[in-house]
């Protein structure tokens, strides 16, 4: 498969922003003189006060600091809305496609301006101002985008929690950033089923200090009956009637935080990733334009949820900064039928489509029929995000969905990077199924071995980035030391991505997956420690270890090894009970796929669990278990192999 190359088609090159020669020239300039390169491209957004310094960054141990365009001031909402009003006020900014195929809305830039100002005034009336944190726990409805942009307009900092997270997870995230205001909906709709968002918010608030959350703003989505606490809760439509649709955009420093987004860490507690204003928007908008070869008039659809970073950068901020028409989808790929994605593409004449390998794999399971009954002729670029895409799924996407005429951009990036780092560019990059190909402008990947030695040429190793780029996260909220420890201490002087990769003879990168204790389930990162501590909290469980294993739909599944307390019996009923327990504690996304009851776990003599061995057994591969002589009880391994749940 690796030998296969798909050359750039002449149709992709025609009208594209860059061809191969231009990519090489721009890339060389971007790494030779980042200051000059980003000084030029920093002008792609409007500045209220122009910047004079461009890059002020250090990856040095103990002195990690990342600042871009730091003396400039700007406002993200101004850049995503106001600056477009004169030239494209009546153009559609957001196409909203509901869970039910009969529901859709077109929101123009002018209407977006009015709606965002209204939402900002509702927040301002509740004491929200510059630097205040606001938690959003919302379905995929236009009000989610209004709320994000309203916070940005005021210089407030939004912290979105994905609507699939449990009340416990929501509570810890509200607590973590100290939000006094929460915006939610009565209920969400997904695949015809209702999600009790407001009820979950009420549950979460019960777990917090009584004086933390002052206001809960509730958008009516289903009209379902929900409990409303007088003095604290208000329906958004009622609050919006009390305010005007004019609200000035507040000028903030380029380094003022725009949002906090919690992501799974390998040590259990989620990390609050902080992204700031200027550099983030420059990078999100530039990657959106070049990676998707976005052109004036294109209809662009990213299927992510705004609860993940992909939704932040590539549904809302990047596309709107570029004056694009961006599609927001409330539903799921299989409701009401497995043709839904392609029906939406035809209905709204989508030109650029960006989804996750897990969605592609699950649709692939249904065969070509549901795809082929639609036209998809409007499509030009197909993107993939969230995890490495296996070559078989890549081929299916290219051949079946794109009829071999659409360029594929297999993008690699992370919550922490703010935007895409390694990717093909449609008019420039020959494609290899399964490879993320080459770095974006200004990005300097480095491969290092376990000792930190930099590897040259074709190799396999740990993927680091040698220097900063404008979209990079600045810190972990409230814990800069954790930021340094997590990303800069393993290989001092470099940003360590936590991913392994292979670089081939053409300089193309192939991402091989996480090398730390984080698993990637359906494109969403899940810290193994988080799932383990949930399992261990169950009264019958003594110890648990969680690893990822190859799953043909999700990419990685969650495999849990569980040691029970003395006298407890492991059976199917307890398996079900533990799955329900984790779902309730963290959310459905963390549900273990396989649970193996084990009398003991493989540990070193110092008591450290040997996860490498557990991973291998979960993968049904014992050919390379490595040296087990250092284990305290080598016999444990034989039992684990004997009773494994994932037999090939």
UniProtKB/Swiss-Prot annotation:
GO biological process per UniProt: acetyl-CoA biosynthetic process from acetate
Nucleotide-binding in keyword set: yes
Residues that, per the record, bind ATP: 386-388, 410-415, 499, 514, 525
Positions of post-translational N6-acetyllysine modification: 608
Enzymatic reactions: acetate + ATP + CoA = acetyl-CoA + AMP + diphosphate
Keywords assigned: Acetylation, ATP-binding, Ligase, Magnesium, Metal-binding, Nucleotide-binding
Post-translational modification: Acetylated. Deacetylation by the SIR2-homolog deacetylase activates the enzyme.
Matches recorded under NCBIfam families: Ac_CoA_lig_AcsA, PRK00174.1
Annotated function: Catalyzes the conversion of acetate into acetyl-CoA (AcCoA), an essential intermediate at the junction of anabolic and catabolic pathways. AcsA undergoes a two-step reaction. In the first half reaction, AcsA combines acetate with ATP to form acetyl-adenylate (AcAMP) intermediate. In the second half reaction, it can then transfer the acetyl group from AcAMP to the sulfhydryl group of CoA, forming the product AcCoA.
UniProt-recorded name of the protein: Acetyl-coenzyme A synthetase
Organism lineage: Bacteria, Pseudomonadati, Pseudomonadota, Alphaproteobacteria, Hyphomicrobiales
Gene transcribed to yield this protein: acsA
């Amino acid at each position: 498969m690796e030998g296969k190359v798909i050359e750039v088609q002449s149709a992709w090159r025609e009208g594209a922003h860059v061809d191969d020669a231009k990519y090489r020239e721009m890339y060389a300039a971007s790494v030779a003189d980042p200051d000059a390169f980003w000084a030029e491209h920093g002008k792609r957004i409007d500045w209220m006060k122009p910047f004079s310094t461009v890059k002020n960054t250090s990856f040095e141990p103990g002195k990690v600091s990342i600042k871009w365009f730091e003396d400039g001031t700007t406002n993200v909402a101004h850049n995503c809305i106001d600056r477009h009003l004169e030239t494209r006020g009546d153009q559609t900014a957001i196409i909203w496609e509901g869970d039910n195929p009969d529901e859709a809305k077109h929101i123009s830039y002018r209407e977006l301006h009015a709606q965002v100002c209204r939402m900002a005034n509702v927040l301002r009336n509740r004491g929200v101002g510059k630097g205040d944190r606001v938690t959003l726990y919302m379905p995929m409805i236009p009000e989610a985008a209004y709320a994000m942009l309203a916070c940005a307009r005021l210089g407030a900092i939004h912290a979105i929690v994905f609507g699939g997270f449990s009340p416990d997870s929501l509570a810890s995230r509200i607590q973590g950033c100290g939000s006094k205001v929460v915006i939610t909906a009565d209920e969400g709709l997904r695949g015809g089923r209702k999600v009790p968002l407001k009820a979950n918010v009420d549950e979460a608030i019960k777990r917090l200090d009584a004086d933390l959350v002052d206001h809960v703003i509730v958008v009516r989505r289903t009209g379902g009956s929900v409990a409303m606490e007088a003095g604290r809760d208000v329906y958004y439509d009622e609050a919006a009637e009390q305010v005007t649709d004019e609200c000035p955009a507040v000028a903030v420093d380029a380094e003022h935080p725009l949002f906090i987004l919690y992501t799974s860490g390998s040590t259990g507690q989620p990390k609050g990733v902080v992204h700031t204003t200027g550099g983030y928007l420059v990078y999100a908008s530039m990657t959106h334009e070049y990676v998707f070869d976005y052109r004036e008039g294109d209809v662009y659809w990213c299927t992510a949820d705004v609860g993940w970073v992909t939704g932040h950068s590539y549904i809302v901020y990047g596309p709107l900064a570029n004056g694009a028409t961006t599609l927001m989808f409330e539903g799921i790929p299989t409701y009401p039928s497995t043709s839904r994605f392609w029906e939406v593409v035809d209905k709204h004449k989508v030109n650029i489509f960006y989804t996750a390998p897990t969605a592609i794999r699950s649709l692939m399971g249904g065969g070509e029929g549901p795809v082929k009954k639609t036209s998809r002729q409007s499509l030009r670029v197909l993107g993939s995000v969230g995890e490495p895409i296996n070559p078989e799924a890549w081929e299916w996407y290219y051949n079946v969905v794109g009829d071999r005429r659409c360029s594929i951009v297999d993008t690699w990036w992370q919550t922490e990077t703010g935007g895409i780092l390694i990717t093909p560019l449609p008019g420039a990059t020959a494609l290899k199924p399964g490879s993320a190909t080459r770095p974006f402008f200004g990005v300097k990947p480095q491969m290092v071995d376990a000792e930190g030695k930099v590897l040259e040429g074709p190799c396999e190793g740990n993927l680091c980035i040698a220097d900063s780029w404008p979209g990079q996260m600045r810190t972990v909220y409230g814990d800069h030391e954790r930021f340094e420890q997590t990303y800069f201490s393993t290989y001092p002087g470099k940003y360590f991505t936590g991913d392994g990769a292979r670089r081939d003879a053409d300089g193309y990168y192939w991402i091989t997956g996480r090398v730390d204790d984080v698993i990637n389930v359906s494109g969403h990162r899940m810290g193994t420690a988080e799932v383990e501590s949930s399992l261990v909290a169950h009264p019958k469980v003594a110890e648990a270890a969680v690893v990822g294993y190859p799953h043909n739909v999700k990419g990685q599944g969650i495999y849990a090894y569980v040691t029970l307390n003395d006298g407890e019996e492991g059976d199917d009923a307890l398996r079900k009970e533990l799955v329900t327990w984790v779902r309730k504690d963290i959310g459905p996304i963390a549900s273990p796929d396989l649970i193996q009851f084990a009398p003991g776990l493989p540990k070193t003599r110092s008591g450290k669990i040997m996860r490498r061995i557990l991973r291998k057994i979960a993968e049904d591969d014992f050919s390379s278990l490595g040296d087990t002589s250092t284990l305290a009880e080598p016999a444990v391994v034989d039992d684990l192999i004997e009773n494994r749940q994932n037999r090939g």
